């Protein structure tokens, strides 16, 4: 039998030596990003550029008026989307600095509306504990200032004026919707030191990597 591999490990980001195992065990590679092709071409691995599945899976953008009606927001005021991550490791380290940034933005623009996307992978007791703990440290921010939204990420991504988010696939979705974004990431000290030593990339976030 032959082995066909779609959505390859991100060897272009770290541990390029894994390409030797790919050559040994995989008969044909289907690339999701254009720049992957040069790696497999140089390694003499048969490949086809198939494109990223997100391009065909994303729903049409949600109209701002529809989004505002759905969540009782004022379409005349700016809306900021916040994505603190879909993993506990991300949310643990990003929730507090993100809400701190929101508090500062609200000081500059009291009419700013903030929606925070809760990942369905995070259970309610854990998520709201982290959220409430982070919120309690912001003296000028209340629960009424941040609307939590679940199961509607694509609407948040497409209807907001801008988003701040953890690095991940969601950044590519925001780029496809042409939504301005700030990409951020924070984790424990030890994993950060390890990543610094094995990662080849000078930038963070799939949109930046594609542009680079």
Label each region the model flagged.
Residues 1-212:
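Nucleotide-activated sugar donor-binding and catalytic core shared by glycosyltransferases
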């Amino acid at each position: 039998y032959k082995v066909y591999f779609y959505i390859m490990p991100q060897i272009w980001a770290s541990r390029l030596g894994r390409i030797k195992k790919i050559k040994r065990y995989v008969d044909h590679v289907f690339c999701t990003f254009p720049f992957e092709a040069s790696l497999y071409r140089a390694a003499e691995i048969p490949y086809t550029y198939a494109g990223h599945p997100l391009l065909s899976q994303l729903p049409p953008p949600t109209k701002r008026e529809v989004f505002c009606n759905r969540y009782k927001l004022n379409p005349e005021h700016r809306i900021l989307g916040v994505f603190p991550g879909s993993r506990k490791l991300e949310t643990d380290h990003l929730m507090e600095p993100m809400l701190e940034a929101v508090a500062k933005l609200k000081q500059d623009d009291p009419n700013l509306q903030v929606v925070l996307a809760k990942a369905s992978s995070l259970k309610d007791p854990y998520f709201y504990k982290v959220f409430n703990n982070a919120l309690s440290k912001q003296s000028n921010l209340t629960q009424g200032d941040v609307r939590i939204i679940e199961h509607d990420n694509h609407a948040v991504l497409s209807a907001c004026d801008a988003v701040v988010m953890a690095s991940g696939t969601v950044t590519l979705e925001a780029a496809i919707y042409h939504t301005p974004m700030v990409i951020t990431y924070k984790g424990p000290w030890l994993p950060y030191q390890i990543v610094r030593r094995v990662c080849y990339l000078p930038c963070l976030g799939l949109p930046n990597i594609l542009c680079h």
